């Protein structure tokens, strides 16, 4: 199916990504970008993801994943093309660059400033992913770094923009991080953090609960150690995550490149 047409561009925030943001990002491995979405734009993205999950609009090329029977990551079923079950309880929805509304947000001017500083002119995305911890459920995501080699890439991207679609709190299973841990480098190319590294680097006194307001965006270094628990409330905890990388990045198994978001050949 064709990408969904957007009748009007998303709000263009006046925020400028400057040296202060860069210095915080370099030191801590993350930086808050503030509210990049207005209330109406936030509502529009929520409505769009609901429509996709409920099969109300075309989902060709978009993949969906439910939570497993338990709350452990190892219990997760594989991702599947299309929406095999009409439910708002999907854990994950991928390939959202194929939806016009989500693509417009991915191409936000602030994201362009960020990618130009850290990547360059020609930028692709490894994933454009909706993540959900449904009410009173969700899957425990173990400590890990987002390592490109573990994803089957020919390099390790470092630039992810994560946007809260709901308030993310300790009660709803917000992300937990170890500030500054990106400076350790890649601990395990297999993606997930080994138990001995967890014991050394993820002690309780080093961990920060990363609470975020709905509509707020965060720039996260891919090597920042992070995890999340389950949602113990009666409301969902939803987010949208985009991993940006150089357009020359390839899949080491197939040699294929990825959807271009900025620069030559970018999606319209």
Where are these regions (language model features)?
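Non-heme Fe(II)-dependent double-stranded beta-helix
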Residues: 4-27, 34-143, 259-265
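Glycine-rich nucleotide phosphate-binding loop and flanking beta-alpha elements
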Residues: 39, 149, 226
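Non-heme Fe(II)/2-oxoglutarate
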Residues: 55, 59-63, 188-192, 217-219, ...
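Active-site rim elements
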Residues: 99-104, 203-208, 228-229
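Catalytic core of non-heme Fe(II) oxygenases with the double-stranded beta-helix
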Residues: 113-114, 137-209, 249-257
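A structural signal for short, well-ordered beta-strand segments
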Residues: 127-130, 161-163, 240-244
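Short acidic-glycine-tyrosine-enriched beta hairpin
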Residues: 207-219
């Amino acid at each position: 199916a064709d990408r969904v047409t957007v009748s009007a561009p998303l709000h263009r925030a006046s925020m400028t990504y400057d040296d202060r943001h860069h210095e915080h990002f370099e030191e801590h491995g993350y930086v808050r970008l503030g509210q990049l979405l207005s209330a109406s734009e936030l509502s529009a993205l929520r409505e769009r993801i609901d429509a996709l999950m409920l099969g109300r609009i075309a989902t060709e090329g978009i993949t969906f994943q439910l939570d497993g029977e338990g709350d452990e990551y190892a219990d997760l079923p594989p991702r599947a093309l299309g929406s095999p079950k009409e439910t708002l309880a999907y854990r994950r929805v991928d390939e959202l660059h194929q939806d016009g509304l989500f693509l417009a947000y991915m191409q936000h001017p602030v994201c362009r400033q960020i990618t130009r500083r850290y990547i360059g002119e020609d930028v692709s995305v490894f994933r454009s992913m909706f993540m959900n911890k449904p009410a009173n459920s969700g899957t425990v995501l173990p400590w890990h770094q987002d390592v490109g080699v573990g994803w089957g890439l020919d390099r390790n991207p470092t630039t992810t923009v994560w946007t809260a679609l709901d308030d993310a709190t300790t009660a709803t299973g917000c992300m937990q991080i170890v500030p500054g841990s990106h400076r350790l480098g890649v601990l395990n190319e297999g993606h997930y953090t080994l138990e001995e590294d967890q014991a050394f680097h993820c002690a309780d006194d080093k961990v920060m609960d990363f609470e975020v307001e709905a509509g707020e965006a965060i720039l996260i270094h891919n090597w920042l150690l992070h995890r999340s628990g389950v949602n113990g409330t009666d409301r969902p905890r939803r987010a949208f995550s985009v991993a940006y990388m150089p357009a020359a990045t390839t899949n080491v198994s197939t040699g294929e490149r990825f959807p271009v978001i900025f620069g030559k050949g970018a999606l319209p």
